[in-house]
Amino acid sequence: MKYRIIIITACLLVFNQSFALSVPPSVSTQWLKKNLKNTELAIIEVSDKVDFTFNNHIPGSVVTNKSDWRYEDSDGSLVRYPVEKLAEKIRRLGINDNDAVVIYYKGNNTDEILGAFYLYWLFHLLGHTNVGVLNEGWHGWLEAKGEIESDSKTIQAGSFVAQPLLALEVKTDELNKIRNHYLLVDGRPATHFQGLTKFEANPRYGRIPGSFNQPWQDYIRKEKNGYWYAKAPKIPKLLARLKVDPDRAILLTCLGGTGSAFNYGIFYAAGYRNLRVDDAALRRWNIRRLPLENTNLNKLNK
């Protein structure tokens, strides 16, 4: 149970910090409306600079995108930048060490949703847990008739300091060693998990032996106006079906780290805190030719 203890102990060091403004993991539009003018609140939009500039945004927000936080490693895996580089990027967004942070996505595509949840996990990884994701994103904000603006503020570098909680990440080699001892959740679509189909970027069909499936797409919706958004459940379907205790240690994987991080955010908001994200995920797992099952089912269906 060593890994479980590491996670809980590390997180408690951060959860015990006191903040003047405390952000819930899943932020309601009512909460954000009430606290919008608070000087200790920082708001980050995940979209692109053109959309942020010309299609309005939540007042006081700054903009970033998913690709700002990841790079292609030498083996072709997409992974987070090193801790200090991530911290510098956060400071450049004007984030201070004691800021309450709300992240939202525009929802022009599902990548923006994944980017928002990935950034949420990165804040946790860097030791800043006073952060939340706006439930239903920009779509929800417009539906609630929240304030919007077109002006962009001048950004002054913030004072953010990383206090890394690296136990919130699990590396590929460690995952292979410990996967039989913990609940391993794969966030890919059901047909990918079943070994029937795959993303083009994935070199192999199949799944990690013993893993369970909770597709992040289960919680994605598209509004008539074209915006995508995530509808957070009270309890994720898989965890409800398996009757998973909130204290149980859970390992999260996907094809890439953004799908893993999406489930991290959804699970965390539902009260599951003993979580570790596989950032390099199945891209690296399959490059290293580590064990899979259901690798030939796609051939049987042709």
Positions of PLM-derived features:
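Thiolate-centered catalytic microenvironments shared by cysteine-dependent enzyme domains
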Residues: V83-E174, T197, G259-A281
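Active-site neighborhoods of enzymes that stabilize oxyanions during catalysis
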Residues: L21, P25-V27, K34, T53, ...
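Sec-dependent N-terminal signal peptides
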Residues: I5-V14
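N-terminal carbohydrate-binding/catalytic regions of secreted carbohydrate-active enzymes
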Residues: T39, I43-R92
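Helix-loop module immediately N-terminal to the HCX5R catalytic loop
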Residues: Y71-V101, W216-I250
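Sec/Tat signal peptide C-region and signal peptidase I cleavage site
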Residues: N16-A20
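Structural recognition of the beta-strand scaffold that forms the well-ordered cores
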Residues: A42-E45, S61-N65, D99-Y104, G132-V133, ...
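C-terminal soluble interaction/assembly domains
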Residues: K237, L242-N301
